[in-house]
Amino acid sequence: MENVYYIIIITAIIFEFLLSSLSSLLDIKNITSKIPESFKKAYNQEKYVKSQQYLEARTRFGLFSNLFSISLILFVIHSELFGILDNYVRNQTESYIFQGLLFIGIIYFIQDIISLPFSIYNSFIIEEKFGFNKSTIKLFFIDKIKGYLIFI
């Protein structure tokens, strides 16, 4: 019976990824530099083209980061790392509440560290390229540390 749940979970994860990726690819396919008639009075051509370039860059990056994420999720599920983490957490405390908090906290921290290069690229490459980034590396990491402190 466990195998059935495993297959259902893996199928749902892959299906959601494929559906999301298809949606993103359709978005990219429909990007055009020609401003729609309904926007001509509200937008100038240059700003519209820049917004479409930004949309494409963000969408392509999202496709790549989602592919990385699903690969990692499938690896973790298949390798039974959740079970290993669960055993570790259960040996740290007998309190079910603290076990749950520790389990979620460790997963959050690991996920945040793994996604750090993607966040840096998004903020300091993509956002910078289009003039949206007003942050510095120092401020970026100070915000990360503040986020960890709030989480604790």
Map each language-model feature to its residues.
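Hydrophobic or amphipathic, alpha-helical segments that drive membrane association/targeting
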Residues: 1-152
